[in-house]
Amino acid sequence: MQIVVGPVLARKGGYAFDCWTPEEGLSRGYTYGRIEDAHYARNVEIRSRTNRGSDQTIACSTVDEFVRLTI
């Protein structure tokens, strides 16, 4: 299964990242109060998907890249 992991972004109340899969569509991420916590959670998500045998995990660095890969 392919997953696209978005960059950490500022949101109301903190920082978050989103994920997208062809099967489930967009999954909004939890909002963390500290940017360090959001980056840590994003890295854990990327590693856990890779370890579970995900066919392809793509970690995006920019919003433009995330949008381009999810349309």
Each model region followed by its residue ranges:
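Basic, amphipathic alpha-helical segments enriched in Lys/Arg and hydrophobic/aromatic residues
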Residues: 43
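A short, exposed loop/beta-hairpin motif centered on an aromatic-Gly-Thr core
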Residues: 24-36, 58
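Short acidic, glycine-rich loop/turn motifs
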Residues: 19-23
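Short N-terminal "domain-start" leader segments
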Residues: 1-18, 47, 53-71
